[in-house]
């Protein structure tokens, strides 16, 4: 894929994502052979699966709290496939943190990635929020154990 084509594709994916059209993102990215996708498109594909699992297209899941376990697990598998490249990338850690939080209904795994994200991007307010959220969830989990 030519660099200008890839740039246009990434812009289009961002537009679809902002319009909650996650299935469109998935269809377009998966039409590209896996060996040609590269790191960034793989992470974007994971994001689309994660968002579809939690929110659904056009937020059809609303606020019901239902998560499609198969889709969120696939999102994590995609991230795992590029772990070597992503471990030091704030965006990869963000996606892994959010996906793990939704997949496991436990903050302990997500917290590890949230902390790494915050280390890599200490001024990112979203990273700060995910760390705080995970800490709150961990406190709640601990209180339930007592």
Residues of each region from the PLM?
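Amphipathic alpha-helical repeat scaffolds of TPR domains
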Residues: 2-14, 35-61, 87-103, 125-142, ...
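Short helix-adjacent coil turns
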Residues: 19-24, 105, 122
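Alpha-helical positions within canonical tetratricopeptide repeat
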Residues: 24, 37, 67-70, 74, ...
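Canonical positions in the second alpha-helix
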Residues: 31-32, 81-82, 116-117
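Structural marker of alpha-solenoid helical repeat scaffolds
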Residues: 34-35, 84-85, 120
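Short coil/linker segments at helix-helix boundaries
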Residues: 50-81, 101-102, 109-110
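Internal alpha-solenoid helical repeat scaffolds
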Residues: 117-120, 125-126
């Amino acid at each position: 894929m030519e660099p200008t084509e890839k740039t246009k594709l990434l812009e289009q994916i961002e537009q679809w994502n902002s319009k909650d059209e996650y299935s469109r993102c998935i269809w377009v990215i998966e039409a590209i052979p896996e060996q040609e996708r590269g790191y960034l498109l793989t992470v974007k594909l994971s994001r689309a699966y994660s968002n579809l699992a939690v929110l659904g297209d056009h937020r059809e899941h609303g606020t019901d709290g239902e998560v499609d376990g198969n889709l969120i697990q696939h999102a994590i598998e995609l991230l795992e496939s590029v772990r070597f490249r992503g471990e030091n990338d704030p965006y990869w850690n963000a996606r892994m943190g959010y996906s793990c939080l939704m997949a496991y209904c436990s903050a302990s795994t997500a917290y590890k990635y949230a902390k790494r994200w915050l280390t890599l991007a200490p001024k990112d307010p979203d990273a700060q929020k995910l760390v705080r959220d995970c800490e709150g969830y961990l406190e709640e989990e601990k209180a339930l154990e007592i």
